[in-house]
């Protein structure tokens, strides 16, 4: 009798712990995703592990993925796979804005994120009635912040259909669906008319392009003459040394875990922009002092990682989450360590800002 009572008690405690970790502790900072809602985008549950293995195999040597035209052409499809694998985990553990921002004294991560996004609208001099393009919009966190801050209309493009559906749902919930539109497409060949946008921006998105010239060229094409473009670029800084094994390991880890066909150098960005016809108005690494470290949130999230790892393992064991989710979650944790090292050593920045303008008269 006592044994039975103890067994029932243990079972009750176990279920209570599952409830606590999954439903109470398992929500994202920005509500909308719970651990039990985790999906792998449009990938069916039985294909998750295979898709993860294919992704990891393709990006095992990042800079080799774009060395030939044939391999470069495969990059968009694997970026799509990457976002199928990680979108729900990002929303659950990070929020609706898939980017970093400098920490602000006495302000929450959410507030720091909003300020970082609103800076884009201010740089673009965005106004009510303007039509802006969000190049690589994800699930639309920046889009909604910029539309609300500026009064502009925003059209976002993402290669991932699952993100399109998530962004549209968030737009409706925020009451911004009349001013925020989302299109599924490749930003290397955008389905928009020439000179159809007043301004454009990309927040930590063009790093997925094998050649930056291609995406910058498309942005140049769809901007109206005189239109402004702001981009936050992931780059290696002048402190990076290719003969330093620790530097190489950190950068390769960032590239492998974030679907990047090779990070570009900081000093390349402006020249590439000029090559496609842009005027460079401003260039600044927003991570430099007096800005506070952008990687603080990653370091503070280590406890959350162990909690979330336990949640993911429990859900996989209960067959609520598909096989392969644990591997994806582990990959993202390891990538976070590489990102932190890149930030602490100063060899990497995710927010090298360039402000560009399409000339009023084409040369």
Swiss-Prot record:
Pathway where it operates: Steroid biosynthesis; sterol biosynthesis
Single GO cellular component term:
membrane
Role summary: Catalyzes the methyl transfer from S-adenosyl-methionine to the methylene group of 24-methylene lophenol to form 24-ethylidene lophenol.
What does the similarity note say?
Answer: Belongs to the class I-like SAM-binding methyltransferase superfamily. Erg6/SMT family.
Q: Which GO terms describe its molecular function?
A: 24-methylenesterol C-methyltransferase activity
Superkingdom as given in the UniProt entry: Eukaryota
Natural source organism: Oryza sativa subsp. japonica
Which EC number(s) does UniProt give?
2.1.1.143
Residue ranges crossing the lipid bilayer per the database entry: 6-26
Query: Could you tell me which SUPFAM superfamilies the record lists for this protein?
Result: S-adenosyl-L-methionine-dependent methyltransferases (SSF53335)
Tell me what reaction this enzyme catalyses: 24-methylidenelophenol + S-adenosyl-L-methionine = (Z)-24-ethylidenelophenol + S-adenosyl-L-homocysteine + H(+)
Keywords, ordered alphabetically: Lipid biosynthesis, Lipid metabolism, Membrane, Methyltransferase, S-adenosyl-L-methionine, Steroid biosynthesis, Steroid metabolism, Sterol biosynthesis, Sterol metabolism, Transferase, Transmembrane, Transmembrane helix
Q: Where is it predominantly found?
A: membrane
Q: Tell me the gene name.
A: Smt2-1
Compartments it resides in: Membrane
Recite the lineage of the species. Eukaryota, Viridiplantae, Streptophyta, Embryophyta, Tracheophyta
Q: Cite a single GO BP annotation.
A: methylation
This protein's name: 24-methylenesterol C-methyltransferase 2
Supply the enzyme class, top level: transferase
User: Which membrane topology term applies here?
Assistant: Single-pass membrane protein
